[in-house]
Amino acid sequence: EASSSSDDNVCCNGCLCDRRAPPYFECVCVDTFDHCPASCNSCVCTRSNPPQCRCTDKTQGRCPVTECRS
């Protein structure tokens, strides 16, 4: 049961657009794993047009939900 206690060591298999905080969307992990590269431990929203969610080693990013096409 000590496997789900820490949220610091999770990594993303992919990122998706989660509209849980309108008028913004958040980039969140699709799946998490116990063992994975530290360079992919969260998701961020790119400044492309339209914005996309991608793996990153930085904190989560947000973009206007109106520009989220996925």
From Swiss-Prot:
Residue pairs linked by disulfide bridges in the UniProt entry: 11-68, 12-29, 15-63, 17-27, 36-43, 40-55, 45-53
GO cellular component, as recorded = extracellular region
Question: What GO molecular function annotation could you give as one example from this UniProt entry?
Answer: serine-type endopeptidase inhibitor activity
Taxonomic lineage: Eukaryota, Viridiplantae, Streptophyta, Embryophyta, Tracheophyta
Q: Where is this site: Reactive bond for trypsin?
A: 19-20, 47-48
**One Pfam family in the UniProt entry:** Bowman-Birk_leg
Supply any other comment. Four inhibitors were found that are identical except at their amino ends and that probably arise by proteolytic degradation of a single gene product.
What role is this protein assigned?
These proteins inhibit trypsin and chymotrypsin, having 2 sites of interaction with trypsin. The site of interaction with chymotrypsin has not been determined but is not independent of the trypsin-reactive sites.
- Keywords, in A-Z order: Disulfide bond, Protease inhibitor, Serine protease inhibitor
Q: What is this protein called?
A: Bowman-Birk type proteinase inhibitor A-II
**To which protein family does this belong?**
Belongs to the Bowman-Birk serine protease inhibitor family.
Q: Which domain of life is it from?
A: Eukaryota
